[in-house]
């Protein structure tokens, strides 16, 4: 049996299934750095180390040992199916007959990085910036498509000592498509504790990354809070409808006329020239901070003091276009909260 084993990105993240697979192996084959990560688990086993770029030779050697009747572990960092040894194994094994194999999944580098950053992943794309095997034009097309679609983007192999062009071109594309304040998570792991930081896209610099780094680029809904990077899914948090909001939507079920309400005694409550069509936000409480709102801690109150989005012309125009399909009166603000939050997300993603 050949077991293609994902050992995870760090020593403490190896799975029980991977441990058992290693225990059942006679021979362990892998890149020298990955072998060091699990060396204490390999007593009494034949261990074969190789260098970077020797992937095909590792597979051929694993098959050779297997045909000798030995159980072989072919180890891969992270998950073997994500830029790991599973892919190259399946390119080679069809040359031979009677090969028994099993793929043992592992914790991927992107999932590990996400766990260190908070909850940055929603719909996301994983893209390697290594152009050793993939044309640079193909990589950049994927970057552009992912950014245009609003996906979170995880970049593997962002920067080599001599391979800098892919990262520079990727950043240029991202900056042309995403707001400069878009959060970017950077997790670098070698042998010790991970180096974790969050910057905005405008500040993303190649001095912060290398080949041991995962870069996670957020989208327009991603925000940061207390050192965590969060991309919300849009769960509906139920709270009672405020009586003033009820009164407003009884009189104005689809909001008031667009534009500033300079006759209001509180105008401007956010900024000069604000659009007052929705004096009371129809999404309250959205309970996610992508537009600046936040919980008043230990009070159970959602504060919109720093959220100006619903008072921008583009937001009002987008919301008015579909709000009538969802609500006909104030009770719908609670009863149809999920549909409302989907509308909010749609308008945010449109920009």
Swiss-Prot record:
Keyword Iron: no
Catalysed reaction, written as an equation: Co(II)-factor III + S-adenosyl-L-methionine + H(+) = Co(II)-factor IV + S-adenosyl-L-homocysteine
Function: May also convert cobalt-precorrin-3 to cobalt-precorrin-4.
Enzyme class: transferase
Keywords associated with the record: Cobalamin biosynthesis, Methyltransferase, S-adenosyl-L-methionine, Transferase
GO biological processes: cobalamin biosynthetic process; methylation
Domain of life: Archaea
Similarity field: Belongs to the precorrin methyltransferase family.
Name of the gene this protein is made from: cbiH
EC number: 2.1.1.-
Pathway connected to this protein: Cofactor biosynthesis; adenosylcobalamin biosynthesis; cob(II)yrinate a,c-diamide from sirohydrochlorin (anaerobic route): step 3/10
Cited InterPro entries: 4pyrrol_Mease, 4pyrrol_Methylase_sf, 4pyrrole_Mease_sub1, 4pyrrole_Mease_sub2, Cbl_synth_CobJ/CibH_dom, Precorrin_MeTrfase, Zf-like
GO MF terms held by the record: methyltransferase activity
Coiled coil start-end: none
Disulfide partners: none
Protein name, per record: Probable cobalt-factor III C(17)-methyltransferase
Pfam family, one: zf-like
């Amino acid at each position: 049996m050949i077991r293609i084993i994902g050992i995870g990105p760090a020593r403490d993240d190896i799975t029980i299934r991977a441990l058992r697979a290693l225990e059942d192996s006679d021979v362990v084959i892998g890149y020298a750095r990955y072998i060091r990560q699990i060396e204490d688990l390999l007593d009494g086993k034949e261990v074969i180390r190789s260098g970077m770029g020797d992937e095909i030779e590792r597979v051929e050697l694993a098959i050779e040992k297997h045909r000798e009747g030995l159980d072989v572990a072919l180890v891969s960092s992270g998950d073997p199916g994500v830029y790991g040894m599973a892919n190259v194994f399946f390119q080679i094994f069809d040359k031979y007959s009677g090969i028994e194999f099993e793929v043992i999944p592992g914790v991927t580098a992107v999932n590990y990085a996400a766990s260190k950053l908070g909850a940055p992943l929603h719909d996301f794309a994983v893209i390697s910036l290594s152009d050793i095997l993939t044309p640079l034009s193909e990589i950049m097309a994927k970057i552009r498509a992912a950014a245009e679609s609003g996906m979170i983007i995880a970049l593997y192999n962002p920067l080599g000592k001599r391979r800098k062009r892919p990262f520079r071109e990727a950043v240029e594309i991202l900056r042309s498509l995403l707001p400069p304040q878009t959060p970017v998570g950077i997790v670098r792991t070698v042998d010790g504790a991970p180096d974790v930081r969050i910057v905005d896209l405008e500040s993303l610099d190649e001095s912060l990354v290398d080949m041991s780094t995962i870069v996670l680029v957020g989208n327009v809904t991603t925000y940061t809070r207390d050192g965590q990077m969060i991309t919300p899914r849009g769960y509906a948090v139920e709270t009672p409808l405020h009586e003033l909001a009820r009164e407003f939507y009884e009189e104005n079920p689809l909001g008031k006329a667009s534009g500033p309400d300079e006759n209001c005694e509180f105008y401007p409550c956010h900024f000069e020239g604000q659009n007052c069509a929705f004096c009371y936000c129809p999404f309250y409480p959205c309970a996610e901070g992508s537009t600046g709102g936040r919980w008043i801690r230990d009070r159970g109150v959602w504060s919109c003091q720093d959220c100006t989005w619903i008072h921008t012309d583009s937001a009002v125009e987008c919301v008015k276009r579909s709000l009538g399909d969802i609500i006909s009166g104030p009770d719908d603000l609670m009863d149809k909260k999920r549909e409302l939050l989907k509308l909010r997300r749609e308008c945010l993603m449109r920009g």
